[in-house]
Regions:
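Bacterial Sec-dependent N-terminal signal peptides
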Residues: 1-28
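Extracytoplasmic/secretory N-terminal segments
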Residues: 2, 23-173
Length: 173
């Protein structure tokens, strides 16, 4: 009987680690977290990055980075200094179409719930992750497609025939 219990414990432990691995693998495979009200309205999706996050808006990427070690020290009560060094910058696609469409593709099986405060208007439930995000017609005849490949975030500018790739111009803030 003891041996069966030991095997059961090993099996449960193995299943737990496989589940955790599956969840983390899916987060990197499906990095785009849909905004269902848990983020400012102009944000379409968020991507968690090592030491920060990427917020995707129409024609704009906002990167936000912070000191991971300091955050861990505060969380684990290893310091009384509550200040965290952080910085942000924006990548802006200049002169984009006002009527571009943004959509997320390939919904994950898993989801998250966000309960922000006591006001249900700020709650977001069943927030799925997605494999890719497309901003269709960001410029006339040009689409922007974002996706994850081997754990890295990528984006392609898809230029249709007879479209001018010189329209794509970026500025940084």
């Amino acid at each position: 009987m003891l041996q069966i219990k030991s095997i059961s414990q090993k099996l449960i432990t193995l299943l737990f680690f496989l589940l955790v691995n599956f969840i983390y693998a899916n987060e990197f495979e499906n990095p785009f977290i849909k905004n269902k009200g848990q983020l400012p309205k102009k944000v379409i999706a968020k991507v968690n990055l090592p030491g920060g996050a990427l917020f995707i808006e129409k024609g704009t990427f906002t990167y936000n980075f912070y000191d991971q070690q300091k955050l861990a020290d505060i969380h684990n009560h290893r310091t009384t200094d509550r200040g965290i060094k952080a910085h942000a910058f924006k990548v802006i696609f200049k002169n984009t179409n006002e009527n571009m469409e943004s959509f997320l593709e390939e919904k994950s099986l898993f989801f998250e719930n966000y309960y922000l405060g006591n006001n249900k208007n700020y709650w977001a439930e069943k927030v799925h992750h997605y494999k890719s995000l497309t901003q269709k017609n960001i410029y006339d005849g040009i689409d922007l497609k974002m996706y994850s490949q081997n754990g890295n975030l990528k984006y392609d500018m898809i230029v249709k025939a007879n479209s001018n790739p010189k329209k794509v111009k970026l500025s940084y803030e």
